[in-house]
Amino acid sequence: MRPWTGSWRWIMLILFAWGTLLFYIGGHLVRDNDHPDHSSRELSKILAKLERLKQQNEDLRRMAESLRIPEGPIDQAPASGRVRALEEQLLKAKEQIENYKKQTRNGLGKDHEILRRRIENGAKELWFFLQSELKKLKNLEGNVLQRHADEFLSDLGHHERSIMTDLYYLSQTDGAGDWREKEAKDLTELVQRRITYLQNPKDCSKAKKLVCNINKGCGYGCQLHHVVYCFMIAYGTQRTLILESQNWRYATGGWETVFRPVNETCTDRSGTSTGHWSGEVKDKNVQVVELPIVDSLHPRPPYLPLAVPEDLADRLVRVHGDPAVWWVSQFVKYLIRPQPWLEKEIEEATKKLGFNIPVIGVHVRRTDKVGTEAAFHPIEEYMVHVEEHFQLLARRMQVDKRRVYLATDDPSLLKEAKTKYPTYEFISDNSISWSAGLHNRYTENSLRGVILDIHFLSQADFLVCTFSSQVCRVAYEIMQTLHPDASANFHSLDDIYYFGGQNAHNQIAIYPHQPRTADEIPMEPGDIIGVAGNHWDGYSKGVNRKLGRTGLYPSYKVREKIETVKYPTYPEAEK
């Protein structure tokens, strides 16, 4: 008897068992027709699992064929190795099937999640609208009307918090919360593997590279976003990002003295040819491309925010309320991995400040932004939203203390906040506020301070700030990497979220609207609206691109238009 014969019989037995498992799964799929609601929810996931099983079955078939060597001398060792590999693959398949059988749900459908978020947004927009209108009424008549208006606002707030609490529990029911947790983790790990693969090519001397200089003339948050923009272009054009950060205005030793290097194996920018950015197609044969700041970028590639990868879009829409922010956050996550000394510094600051949850993060930007990019907002404006969210948190958790992490560049604000709100516990480091002043801003101590502020703001349960500040937006982005979906965990006193240099932010009308005042614009379902901002009173401002008219429209009558781009998928990262 030839030595391969026993192995071949064993292979046939494995394939038979594999076929039986496929038949078993198929049988479950057929039986699920008796429960159409459950089947429709599970169908796409089951089909995906079956497709993977079929692929593994095909792999087994090819491995079996490689063992069928009818002529020539036989080497028993490789055959035994292949058999062991088959055994391991079969065991893994059995584990996958057992896990699948135990899993009662795999999350809800995309439409369910979109509707849930629409209800949530609609309730919030209704609240903003009623608050605004009733506050106007308070000034029209005497004390009686004012008292009734106050009571009505209080009752209305109670209703709104009840709706939001119910929606939260809806999002966690029937295993949906567990599914969202796992799906977000899987997506994050997938993207981080792809980035790591791109940043560490096998042969650095032959790799295509994109060079980015960190020293854009602006503050830390702005410079970090500059590097994120470079990274997204590098990822889209399949070029390894080379970050030039020597003589960084915050740390002369460069980025790597604070954060882990963006590359482990490829830090050299040298190449056979070098050129300035002239477009993905024109730069095809240029090995090293230098990228300008986004303000000077021409031509503009499709990889800029707010676009997301086409291959991930459907999964992202299901799991996250703002896929564009999630996508940006993945590059931030990779970039700000701390060096050991910084990690230790964060741990020590956490203990020293007594940072604990629940806590709401408040970022108050004064100094250079006020009067230029942002208006002045008193602490009372922030605390209204802090109080509202603590009342909401109290519906679903024990709130032992009402803690607020206060980050500001105004050293006098901490004392003011403590005086005006004695029932709150304010966590803050005034030395950071002093270091954030204009005269101290570009120092290593200032860098330490802004990193700590952003860290603690991102760790909060909710964020109240002005999105005109890059520090606030960075904290919000990092927050997305700490939760499956933290897209709604903020209130901005001014702008909606944006990324400097982004492409147009568009929405799609889902309800018709007829203007009641000259300030409003008409809409029909399907109209594309270029959004300029949310007034947080039930109305947003934008342009109806079909009509070319700019004005106000009810925020609840539109939905976000998700822009997708055919990014590379880096299959090599999975090998």
Swiss-Prot record:
Domain called SH3: residue spans: 502-563
InterPro entries, per database record: Fut8 (IPR015827), Fut8_N_cat (IPR045573), Fut8_SH3 (IPR035653), GT23_dom (IPR027350), SH3-like_dom_sf (IPR036028), SH3_domain (IPR001452)
Biological pathway: Protein modification; protein glycosylation
The protein's enzyme class: transferase
Posttranslational mods: Tyrosine phosphorylated by PKDCC/VLK.
Chain ranges passing through the membrane: 10-30
GO-annotated biological processes: GDP-L-fucose metabolic process; N-glycan fucosylation; protein N-linked glycosylation; protein N-linked glycosylation via asparagine
Domain GT23: residue ranges: 206-493
Positions bearing Phosphoserine: 278
Keyword Disulfide bond tagged: yes
SUPFAM superfamilies: SH3-domain
Molecular function in Gene Ontology: alpha-(1->6)-fucosyltransferase activity; glycoprotein 6-alpha-L-fucosyltransferase activity; SH3 domain binding
Annotated disulfide bonds: 204-266, 212-230, 218-222, 465-472
Localisation: Golgi apparatus, Golgi stack membrane
The EC number(s) this enzyme carries: 2.4.1.68
GO cellular component: Golgi cisterna membrane
Recorded family membership: Belongs to the glycosyltransferase 23 family.
Protein purpose: Catalyzes the addition of fucose in alpha 1-6 linkage to the first GlcNAc residue, next to the peptide chains in N-glycans.
Name this polypeptide is given: Alpha-(1,6)-fucosyltransferase
Taxonomic source organism: Canis lupus familiaris (Dog)
